[in-house]
Regions:
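N-proximal helix/coil linker or "cap" segments that precede and/or mark the start of modular domains
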Residues: 210-256
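Short coil/turn connectors between adjacent alpha-helices in alpha-solenoid helical repeat scaffolds
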Residues: 155-156, 194-203
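Amphipathic alpha-helical repeat scaffolds of TPR domains
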Residues: 178-193
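Short coil/turn linking the two alpha-helices of tandem helical-hairpin repeats
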Residues: 190-197, 239
Length: 256
């Protein structure tokens, strides 16, 4: 992941306030995920003795931020609404699984970061579950007298976990076209398993439809523009491949 250093400058801003336990003088880094640059480092802070520190970020548009501990193994993804401050409590060594997110002031209105946190925690739990099934298979594949049955059971269990994630990802994309949650969700994967498989025509069509809705609501947002470009390019390539294969078989192309 490319990382650049960037200063926020003096402009209208909002606050991301952290209350971190077990920080032990270790720093936290806040990145902005840029559509054309990747992760750009905004600031790095050490929580005070009470575990508190505050980042200030621009509040002029929808943006995506990544909060990371010093090992950079797990990123807590945040998508605050403009002018919406956030208060985050978490354990330093388990940012995602232990985090709670609260908009400041408390409000009944949409808080995308809270919605996205729930999905990140669901992903983290799914990773642990899949790892458990994988370990069970690896530890017993040479000992079990019913290898085929064991493999089938583990595969079926993993497929069930992925299917649950897939259904939730589609729901989030469908219900959050006014913010940037779909941009994050579309790229989620567990190992080499993408939650939403862009090679599936139906999935690609669904995501294109969601992105078109996002484009109508946020036509100038760089993340939305880039996502629309990427999905349209994949769709164009797929259609060209279908035409090529049909021409090879002598069939008449019937592509919508």
């Amino acid at each position: 992941m490319p990382v650049l250093l960037c200063a926020c400058g003096k402009q209208p801003s909002q606050t991301v306030e952290l209350n971190i336990s077990h920080a032990r003088k270790r720093a936290l880094a806040l990145f902005e995920l840029k559509a054309d640059q990747g992760a750009v480092l905004l600031d790095s802070l050490r929580p005070d003795k009470k575990g508190v520190c505050r980042f200030r970020v621009p509040c002029d548009s929808l943006r995506i931020y990544l909060l990371a501990s010093s090992d950079n193994e797990h990123f807590l993804c945040l998508t605050p609404m403009p002018h919406q401050d956030l208060r985050i409590s978490a354990n330093y060594d388990s940012l995602v699984s232990s985090a709670t997110v609260q908009p400041i002031p408390a409000t009944d209105s949409l808080c995308p970061s809270l919605i996205l946190l729930a999905y990140q925690q669901q992903i983290a739990q799914a990773e642990r579950t899949i790892r458990s099934y994988t370990d069970t298979w690896m530890e017993n594949r040479y000992q079990s007298t019913q290898v085929d049955s064991l493999h089938e059971a583990c595969t079926r269990a993993i497929d069930s976990v992925m299917d649950t994630l897939r259904q939730e990802a589609r729901r989030l994309c469908r219900q959050n076209t006014a913010n940037l949650i779909p941009v994050v969700v579309i790229n989620k994967a567990i190992g080499n398993r993408r939650v939403l498989d862009l090679s599936e025509p139906e999935t690609l069509a669904f995501l294109l439809d969601c992105t078109k809705q996002m484009q109508r609501l946020n036509p100038q947002n760089p993340h939305v523009k880039r996502l629309m470009f990427q999905l349209a390019r994949i769709d164009s390539y797929r259609k060209q491949e279908e035409i090529r294969l049909l021409e090879q078989t002598g069939e008449e192309p019937q592509i919508p």
